[in-house]
Amino acid sequence: MGSLLSIVLRSATRIIRPIIPSSVLSLLSGPKPVHPLQTLQFDKEAILEKYQAERAKRLRQDGVSQFKSARSGAYDRFRQDVARPQSREPIEAETKVLIVGAGFAGLVAAVKLDQQGVQDFRIVDKAAGFGGTWYWNQYPGAACDVESLIYLPFLEETGYIPSRRFCYGPEIREQVNRVVAKWDLARRSHLSTEITSMTWDESILRWHVKTNHGDHFITQFVVMATGTFHEPKLPGIPGIENFKGDHFHSGRWDYRITGGDETGNMSQLANKTVGIIGTGASAVQLVPKLARDAKKLYVFQRTPSSIRFRDNSLYDTPSLKKSLPPGWQRQRMTDFANILTGQVVDQDCDALEGLQELTMRAILKEASDAGVTVQPEQIPELMQLADFRLMQQIRGQVDEIVKDQETAAKLKPWYSFMCKRPTFHNDYLAAFNNPNVELVDTDGQGVSYLTETAVVANGREYEVDLLVYSTGFDFDVEANFYRRTGIQLVGSRGRTFDEKWDEKGPSTLFGVHIREFPNLLYVGPAQTGVTANWTHTTYAVGDHIAEFVAKSLRDGQYQAFEPTEEAEEEWGRRNEEGSEMRLLFAQSCPPGYYNREGKPEEIPARWAYFPKGIIEWTRITQEWREKGDYQGMDKR
């Protein structure tokens, strides 16, 4: 369209030149219009040099090993359930499907199975309640950072509309329990139960599953929905075991120590000095609550987060409920995912607030408004300029909010927007204006060590009564399955899950089916279609699992399924597409869990998400199921 228009304009200029003023002709024959982003005055080299300098100062030789899993010996108490689960008698039972995990992925799989007519299943989870991440993360201020209307599962089916755009933990768990009640899932669940081993028995084509209570389940299918944000990760700093004050991980908040609840009101901190190590997504939500209630708060920072504001207003629930057509939630999820991947959708999707500036949709709209046609070869430059602009705005916002210039400078993020998990909070930056709050920036080095009573950073001791580790979860993609789950998983050829994947990284079909582990259905990000809304991924994978299991049980012809080696290899190759570009970007970022603490080259390309996104993954898997011949599967 753009080239056709230019031909028309050039022809018109030649024809009408005698009767058009020279000033107008100069506009027609002058420089071509440029995208508004290309008019911005950025010193690209200086910005990228600053990014690299900030990255370099944070790099460590020990990489991910600088952190300690809470499963390791001395740190085990940091992962224990505050609910103090009780002992019970062992259970011996057979079932068609055993679901490992009662978080969103496990619950969605259970509901999808139920909807497909498969009701002989059991759910097992180490937590004392449902919700997975949202069971463990009950710290003050915990809230979702994806719009509630697409994040909370089964809103349409339960008839519930969230109270606000980004709802808080208690409301999320209320919806979880609403789902549990509607589909009678509690009756089929075993909570406060940790699976210790799973072994395939080829003689009966079933899994033997054992737990810490001495349970023994025999099951045909296993849905492995163990999740990612549940096993606390601690900084590997000397002295943790010797600290005499109170200390816990943010994912195991202990209100017996702080008082209050998830809204705050931590009255028992009124005369205490509190330290928090970490400034990631959880800390950003926590700090304003601690700032309000603690006598003194030290915030120990390695790398600042990018902070954005959001409208978190209340919904007009009755009118919103009336306006939503059938199928609205799944459609809204689809629109959200499509826009993020640059696809054209029929309507605007305000669920993208805070993310829309870097989408192709936004860049093309800005071009259209300026009368500019974007050529494919311009897209990388425009995306980078959009990122520069956004990060400049984020840093400018820090200057506007934080009164102390030295503190403001230390809170500014110097990296590309998606290098670290984006965070959103309207009160985090302002908390540093409180006289009782002190930022302890470690210039990328982290805390040095703990004494019996203090945190040592930058050569200075900071005495604290309570220390909170807001240092994330054991999300390292290279961490072995046993370390992350505590499950000794042994397949049909006598090899463990870790021995299989240690060869060359994940080998799967669709990210779900795994050779040597028959009837094991894996729910995880590797080789699966994902989007910024994890709930959407659980829906897509849940549909695939439920329809696959239901068809297998209805047909009854085969008892066990596992992908062929050729099918795994082909799917692995498809997942490696674009890995070079992903690696280059990750190598430009400061250390974090996105890039294996600054060593992304150690991550096999096969650990990547399916590169074409959740919508294409859904289409591929749906077509595979509709063919009905289990293509790429060994069957017996």
Swiss-Prot record:
Keywords: FAD, Flavoprotein, Monooxygenase, NADP, Oxidoreductase. Its cofactor is FAD. NADP(+) binds at A143, C144, D145, T279, G280, A281, S282, A283, V284, Q285, R302, T303, K420, R421. It comes from the Eukaryota. It catalyses: ketocytochalasin + NADPH + O2 + H(+) = iso-precytochalasin + NADP(+) + H2O; iso-precytochalasin + NADPH + O2 + H(+) = cytochalasin Z16 + NADP(+) + H2O. The keyword Translocase does not apply. It holds the Pfam family Pyr_redox_3. The keyword NADP applies. Belongs to the FAD-binding monooxygenase family. Ketocytochalasin monooxygenase; part of the gene cluster that mediates the biosynthesis of a family of the mycotoxins cytochalasins E and K. The hybrid PKS-NRPS synthetase ccsA and the enoyl reductase ccsC are responsible for fusion of phenylalanine with an octaketide backbone and subsequent release of the stable tetramic acid precursor. The polyketide synthase module (PKS) of the PKS-NRPS ccsA is responsible for the synthesis of the octaketide backbone. The downstream nonribosomal peptide synthetase (NRPS) amidates the carboxyl end of the octaketide with a phenylalanine. This is Ketocytochalasin monooxygenase. It comes from Aspergillus clavatus (strain ATCC 1007 / CBS 513.65 / DSM 816 / NCTC 3887 / NRRL 1 / QM 1276 / 107).
